[in-house]
């Protein structure tokens, strides 16, 4: 099986975003704008939570894939590169989660 990275997914979304909306779900979602894309991301997040709580492993995998895809679409529309998100994660993981949270609450 070929391994797909989040960077690969980011590139796929960017490519498909440039297609005609009648030919691509991604292009249609991008053309609809950030409110529509963000709403869809929220729906997928809720579906992922429900799958996790219900203990449905297969559905959790499926919904997680949908969630990651829709996050990439939202980031694409906002012109936020995945690398910016990964850099923030790297910064946060350089310290304990509790310390990182305390730093955010008491800047």
Swiss-Prot record:
Q: In the record, which residues are listed under signal peptide?
A: none
Q: Which CDD domains match?
A: NTP-PPase_HisIE_like
From the Swiss-Prot or TrEMBL record, state where the protein is found.
Answer: Cytoplasm
GO CC entries: cytoplasm
Source organism superkingdom: Bacteria
InterPro entries according to UniProt: HisE, PRib-ATP_PPHydrolase-like
Q: Which UniProt keywords apply?
A: Amino-acid biosynthesis, ATP-binding, Cytoplasm, Histidine biosynthesis, Hydrolase, Nucleotide-binding
The annotated pathway is: Amino-acid biosynthesis; L-histidine biosynthesis; L-histidine from 5-phospho-alpha-D-ribose 1-diphosphate: step 2/9
Question: What does the record give under GO molecular function?
Answer: ATP binding; phosphoribosyl-ATP diphosphatase activity
Q: Name one GO biological process term.
A: L-histidine biosynthetic process
Q: Does the keyword 4Fe-4S apply?
A: no
Task: Report the EC code(s) recorded for this entry.
Answer: 3.6.1.31
Q: What catalytic activity does the UniProt entry give for this protein?
A: 1-(5-phospho-beta-D-ribosyl)-ATP + H2O = 1-(5-phospho-beta-D-ribosyl)-5'-AMP + diphosphate + H(+)
Entry-linked Pfam families: PRA-PH (PF01503)
Q: What family is this protein classified in?
A: Belongs to the PRA-PH family.
Put simply, this protein is called: Phosphoribosyl-ATP pyrophosphatase
Name the gene for this chain.
hisE
């Amino acid at each position: 099986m070929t391994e797909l990275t989040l960077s690969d997914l980011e590139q796929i979304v960017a490519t498909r975003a440039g297609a005609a909306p009648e030919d691509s779900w991604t292009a249609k979602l991008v053309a609809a704008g950030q409110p529509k894309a963000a709403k869809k991301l929220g729906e997928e997040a809720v579906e992922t939570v429900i799958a996790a709580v219900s203990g449905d492993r297969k559905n959790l995998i499926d919904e997680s894939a949908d969630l990651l895809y829709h996050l990439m679409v939202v980031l694409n529309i906002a012109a936020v590169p995945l690398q910016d998100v990964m850099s923030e994660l790297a910064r946060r993981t350089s310290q304990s989660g509790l310390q990182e949270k305390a730093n955010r609450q008491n800047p």
